[in-house]
Design a protein with these regions (language model features):
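Non-catalytic cap/lid and distal C-terminal segments of serine-dependent acyl enzymes
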Residues: 2-162
């Protein structure tokens, strides 16, 4: 078993009796620092809780759903943890990554790229389903047997294909 991976707390805020936090870690899958959000309901103080991963759409990031949807209120009521990954690697150094709004940065499509130079960093399918999933299970009271995935727009595509 691998040793526990380190995460950095960027911010944490009281939210509907739980905590909405934003974090960062160095990703093995993308080779870049990655940010993500987690809403932890109060029920997680005494037992592991079910988890829903929300995959955001084009041009979004790990904060979009957390600050715009208001889903924490409902997650708190039902004892659900919400996880919001960023939509792509950022600051990858790949030429052209920031050239268009619908390709590259903020447009990872939750797939693993197969062509160079994208394949080195754009590994969002593996990032969400392997690395971030493990990270959440290691650092938060999450139920491994109760994990769901949903999304909007590009994130809906990701939820259907993953």
């Amino acid at each position: 078993m691998q040793s526990e991976r380190t995460i950095t707390t960027l911010s944490e805020h009281a939210c509907f009796g739980g905590v909405q936090g934003f974090y960062q870690h160095d990703s093995d899958e993308t080779g870049t620092p990655m940010k993500f959000g987690v809403f932890v309901p109060r029920q997680a103080s005494s037992k592991p809780v079910p988890v829903l991963f929300f995959l955001a759409g084009l041009t979004c990031n790990e904060e979009t759903f957390a600050i715009k949807a208001g889903a924490q209120q409902h997650a708190a009521l039902h004892g659900l943890m919400l996880v919001t990954p960023d939509t792509s690697p950022r600051n990858s150094g790949v030429e052209g990554a920031d050239a268009a709004w619908d390709f590259g940065t903020a447009a990872g499509f939750y797939l693993d790229a197969t062509e160079s130079p994208w394949s080195k960093h754009w590994r969002m399918g593996s990032y969400v389903t392997r690395e971030l999933r493990r990270l959440v299970l290691e650092h938060f009271k999450a139920r491994e047997d109760r994990i769901g995935l949903f999304g909007h727009s590009m994130g809906g595509h990701g939820a259907l294909t993953l």
